[in-house]
Amino acid sequence: MSEKFFEIFEKKLEKLKEQNLYRSVKDMESRHGMEITIQGKKYINFASNDYLGLSQHPLVKEAGIDAIKTFGAGGGASRLLSGGTILHRKLEELLSEFKNTESCLILNSGYTANTSLIPALAGENDIIFSDELNHASIIDGCRLSRAEKIIYKHADIEDLKKLIRNISCKGKKVIITDTVFSMDGDIAPIRELYELCKAEGALLYIDDAHGTGVLGNGYGILKHLGLQTEAFVIQMGTLSKAIGVFGAFVCGDSSIIDWFINSARGFIFSTSLPPSTVASAYASLKIIMEDKELIKRLWQNIEKVMEIIKNLELKTTKTQTPIIPILFENIEQAIKASRILYDSGIYAPVIRPPTVKTPRIRITITAGHSDNDIEKLSGALTLLNSIF
């Protein structure tokens, strides 16, 4: 019987390979700045979400090492048992200050956050309105919720208005969106969503994973748009992208955060983040709040690469962020393009269905990229352009 089960999986994998949809893991042997080594060969990494390069900042690494010396390597238990430390509390207080909210809770990953917080926030008799291009973790969080789910067209505020105004709801209406869409790099119409929630008495749950540390001088989407923090806005974000470490957080009204502590299953039933991770995230966040040079450098690099893309007339999206996709007509072209970049010393893997509808190379820019790195990327993209 077990052999038959294995055959089922083998056939499924074979089908993925035939369709060029099979994925495999490539592991780094070392990393120095934006230079990585894979199977003995060095590449410039243009596939990292470490937008400010803070994962390798000396103060961030030192903070983690010091925490291990004081608290050990692991959390040991959930926060509701004995897994919490003063470091966890200090990070939550700093994140509350950073996002200008009453309270904050840290969780173990962005995926854990969305699949735990959304079911805790919206349940029976509630209605969720979710952007059609929201991250997989939001989609899965909505599926786990007992609320009714309504999908609106991507970033289409008029479509959402029609939907939200033409449906009756016994409970809460909750609008959920990424702020920056991770595969296209575009920004959601947050100002319009904010005003719509105000008018309709709805909650606004925003996933600012790719906006935190990048937009609004580092403070995220609300600061970027000059919007005030309000009780109806719940701000989720991650510690793993611009902050450069690992984990996630949610900031908002103290009563909502307290409810999450008591009902978000991914928080209640998970061992806490290691103290070293928390200490490193705290050090990183302090750098973002106090030193704006890295953010300035990031945006300078984004402008340089966007100019290269424009001059080469490569097909891209309406990106407004460090995420710069190069689009291709089919999977075969995208795979070939990724190999050309790979052979040129540029690490930028192909993104294929079902992650996205249109195959692409997703280039991400960081403050850690040097002028030489960008020049090397320019040469590789020029070669790419001559072939396609």
Curated annotation (Swiss-Prot):
It catalyses: 6-carboxyhexanoyl-[ACP] + L-alanine + H(+) = (8S)-8-amino-7-oxononanoate + holo-[ACP] + CO2. It is an enzyme of class 2 (transferase). Keywords: Biotin biosynthesis, Pyridoxal phosphate, Transferase. Pathway: Cofactor biosynthesis; biotin biosynthesis. Its cofactor is pyridoxal 5'-phosphate. Catalyzes the decarboxylative condensation of pimeloyl-[acyl-carrier protein] and L-alanine to produce 8-amino-7-oxononanoate (AON), [acyl-carrier protein], and carbon dioxide. This is Putative 8-amino-7-oxononanoate synthase. It comes from Thermodesulfovibrio yellowstonii (strain ATCC 51303 / DSM 11347 / YP87). The lineage of its organism: Bacteria, Pseudomonadati, Nitrospirota, Thermodesulfovibrionia, Thermodesulfovibrionales. The gene is bioF.
